[in-house]
Amino acid sequence: MQNAGLSPTPSLRALGGLAMAALLSTVWLWWRLGAAPGGAPAPQPTTTILVWHWPFASQPPELPGDTCTRYGVARCRLTVNRSLLAGADAVVFHHRELQTQQARLPLAERPRGQPWVWASMESPSHTRGLGRLRGVFNWVLSYRRDSDIFVPYGRLEPREGPAPPLPAKRGLAAWVVSNFQKRQRRVQLYRQLALHLRVDVFGRAAGQPLCASCLLRAVAGYRFYLSFENSEHRDYITEKFWRNALLAGAVPVVLGPPRAAYEAVAPPDAFVHVDDFGSARELAAFLTSMNESCYRRYFAWRDRFRVRLFSDWRERFCAICARFPQLPRGQVYQDLEGWFQA
């Protein structure tokens, strides 16, 4: 005989199951809609990013509450108010000011669990003082594709509408350079190329400085642009590629990381890589002998994509908020220098 005190009747079991199902459905609905038990939508928290010192500027720009909304990032607040250190969700430090000691790390006690972000868009060759920053930073914001917050100098995005016509060409190759040092590989390669083809040089080093818009207009009249980076490092592809060449409407002749790094961010037929040639003479012969049909193929990407630049530090810092939910908690860069030099 069944003991009624130990086992509920079938009807009671059914009622209990229905009640539990209703409760679970309600909880699931609250979770999906972000609603509080009272029915009102649960407020979404705003992420506050404290910029400890603004890059390259003694006076930071205006940072209204909707700054990041302009870049498609909601519920993100940028501030330079250091009194908010204790309550900031993350604090970001631009390395150049730490390197030159124009700025220092906070003297106040670091809030427990607060992530600190190391930010730099410079190459390792122009970065010093990382050794004293062991165990300080949790996240990295840089051009490196393996950064916690990856911020490229530019990227290709789907184009809406037809591409603008290609600018008329009157010259073969151009180069804009401000820092001209004989020991740099780019200077050595330029001098070798100049023995075999004409390269028109602009910029401070040539005594012909150009404003940003002037640069684009000047380069647009050339078939090729020497997108030579000042140093060769992993993923270091700067505005020399994105703005000075692709945006201007010239085919970039690139000197920088290996071809694979460029192919990770642009079509393989959108640029000429110097490493594909055994000598400067071979490269010069390739450029000077290219017919119009072959040349036009280097612009096939323009039918599908447009260039978007990321040059505004406000947008770069807003990217921290965009990545914030996915960023690794508890991570510490014990050897930031070793990571960055790799």
Swiss-Prot record:
Reactions listed under catalytic activity: an N-acetyl-alpha-neuraminyl-(2->3)-beta-D-galactosyl-(1->4)-N-acetyl-beta-D-glucosaminyl derivative + GDP-beta-L-fucose = an alpha-Neu5Ac-(2->3)-beta-D-Gal-(1->4)-[alpha-L-Fuc-(1->3)]-beta-D-GlcNAc derivative + GDP + H(+); a neolactoside IV(3)-alpha-NeuAc-nLc4Cer + GDP-beta-L-fucose = a neolactoside IV(3)-alpha-NeuNAc,III(3)-alpha-Fuc-nLc4Cer + GDP + H(+); a neolactoside VI(3)-alpha-NeuNAc-nLc6Cer + GDP-beta-L-fucose = a neolactoside VI(3)-alpha-NeuAc,V(3)-alphaFuc-nLc6Cer + GDP + H(+); an alpha-Neu5Ac-(2->3)-beta-D-Gal-(1->4)-beta-D-GlcNAc-(1->3)-beta-D-Gal-(1->4)-[alpha-L-Fuc-(1->3)]-beta-D-GlcNAc derivative + GDP-beta-L-fucose = an alpha-Neu5Ac-(2->3)-beta-D-Gal-(1->4)-[alpha-L-Fuc-(1->3)]-beta-D-GlcNAc-(1->3)-beta-D-Gal-(1->4)-[alpha-L-Fuc-(1->3)]-beta-D-GlcNAc derivative + GDP + H(+)
Biological process according to GO: fucosylation; inflammatory response; leukocyte migration involved in inflammatory response; lymphocyte migration into lymph node; positive regulation of cell adhesion; positive regulation of cell-cell adhesion; positive regulation of leukocyte adhesion to vascular endothelial cell; positive regulation of leukocyte tethering or rolling
Annotated GO CC locations: membrane
Record organism: Bos taurus
Glycosylation sites per record: N81, N291
PANTHER family noted in UniProt: ALPHA- 1,3 -FUCOSYLTRANSFERASE, ALPHA-(1,3)-FUCOSYLTRANSFERASE 7
Pathway assignment: Protein modification; protein glycosylation
Tissue spec: Expressed in thymus, spleen, liver and lung. Highly expressed in the thymus and lower expressed in the lung.
Keywords, sorted A to Z: Disulfide bond, Glycoprotein, Glycosyltransferase, Membrane, Signal-anchor, Transferase, Transmembrane, Transmembrane helix
TM ranges: 12-31
Alphabetized Pfam families for the sequence: Glyco_tran_10_N, Glyco_transf_10
Topology class, membrane: Single-pass membrane protein
InterPro entries: Glyco_tran_10_C (IPR055270), Glyco_tran_10_N (IPR031481), Glyco_trans_10 (IPR001503), GT10-like_C_sf (IPR038577)
Function (record text): Catalyzes the transfer of L-fucose, from a guanosine diphosphate-beta-L-fucose, to the N-acetyl glucosamine (GlcNAc) of a distal alpha2,3 sialylated lactosamine unit of a glycoprotein or a glycolipid-linked sialopolylactosamines chain through an alpha-1,3 glycosidic linkage and participates in the final fucosylation step in the biosynthesis of the sialyl Lewis X (sLe(x)), a carbohydrate involved in cell and matrix adhesion during leukocyte trafficking and fertilization.
Record lineage: Eukaryota, Metazoa, Chordata, Craniata, Vertebrata
Disulfide bond sites: C68-C76, C211-C214, C318-C321
Name of this protein: Alpha-(1,3)-fucosyltransferase 7
